[in-house]
Design a protein with these regions (language model features):
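Hydrophobic alpha-helical targeting segments used for export or membrane insertion
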Residues: 2-12
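Flexible low-complexity loop/turn motifs enriched in small/helix-breaking residues
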Residues: 12-98, 134-159
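Short beta-strand elements that form the blades of beta-propeller/WD-repeat-like
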Residues: 99-105
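Structural motif
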Residues: 110-116
Length: 159
């Protein structure tokens, strides 16, 4: 019994050194150039700057159990599961017309910057409108080009 406990203690992973933990769970924010979408577009640099119904739809879509980290927050950039650190991190969002285009980082094997757009549903009987994910708006790569494409009506085939 004691030998088993000693073997288990020996095989237990040592805590990550602080610099490794930081690189894996709190990597630096990417430097993103401004994206000129023309007049009337607004920008949010934090989830806190989004309307409540947009945040609610993001939470529903991405699973409330594993929320998206806010800009600059903890973010698991690798495919190694290491605690409750989210594998998505908000970068910024643009509102133009009926859309909020969300820029975020995805960690893991297929890591990198992504977009997803939410479109405003028409007002309901009580006058309130809601936002829903717009199908075909998940793009990777140059987020500004993707945002302009989404606003021009381009949709991806894989969504």
């Amino acid at each position: 019994m004691i030998a088993t406990m000693l073997l288990g203690a020996t095989l237990q992973a040592a805590p990550l050194p602080p610099e490794v933990w930081k690189e894996r769970n709190r990597p630096d924010m990417p430097v993103l150039p401004p994206c000129d979408l023309g007049g009337g577009a607004t920008i949010a640099h934090s989830i806190k700057g989004l309307p409540a119904d947009v945040v609610s739809e993001l939470t529903r879509f991405f699973d409330a159990a594993i929320p998206m980290s806010d800009a600059g927050g903890p973010f698991n950039s690798t495919d190694v599961v290491d605690g409750p650190v989210p594998n998505r991190r908000f970068l910024r969002a643009y509102q133009a017309g009926r859309y909020w285009v969300i820029w975020y980082e995805l960690g893991g094997f297929v890591s990198g910057p992504r977009t997803i757009a939410l479109h405003r549903n028409p007002a309901r009987g009580n006058g309130a409108s809601t936002f829903r994910m717009a199908p075909g708006t998940a793009f990777a790569g140059d987020l500004c080009i993707a945002t302009k494409a989404i606003l021009a009506g381009v949709r991806s085939a894989s969504s």
